[in-house]
């Protein structure tokens, strides 16, 4: 039997903090330059500003600078702008949906899913930004795990984003029981991603399921990445 060789892909998750850097300057073009250096095929962003009354949309500017298509999943309005998650891709997006993860009176959150057609194979990309409260994250992690486990959604799945958990807590334990977790310690000596300039916490994570292989993991620490946002990009080279 002849097996079709797996397709290599570079994926990145990056909380861009409304394009506001550690120097308190709002520069979406700086975020785009960081991502241009990463040279990823699929990009999952959190804390993204979309269209607003001024017509200035950070995701439009970043997408145009990178020459990539994009889909936004807004959770609320911030100063008149759409605000939430966004996925950019060099490959066609076949399907897009978002699931509400909001809990009680906490800030609105969502799980964004985009199905990307990679040379005839579908990769399900889940982009998430969990809350800061422990009980909130527990609810969100349980709901996330249930959504990703949907048996009607088959094929390789990758779940990545800002999980707002910096040690092996309840959320990490719950998700690791349902999904495969990328052991960053296997690839990285320094795996902390927050805050950008002097990272002391590891908030960004990658989980996956199905026929998918992880080849390489990197936290980008270029001079520009250290100031462009309060997070550092977490990069994964995979094969599907």
Tell me what each language-model feature is.
Residues 1-42, 64-65, 69-240:
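Active-site regions of metal-assisted phosphoester/phosphodiester hydrolases
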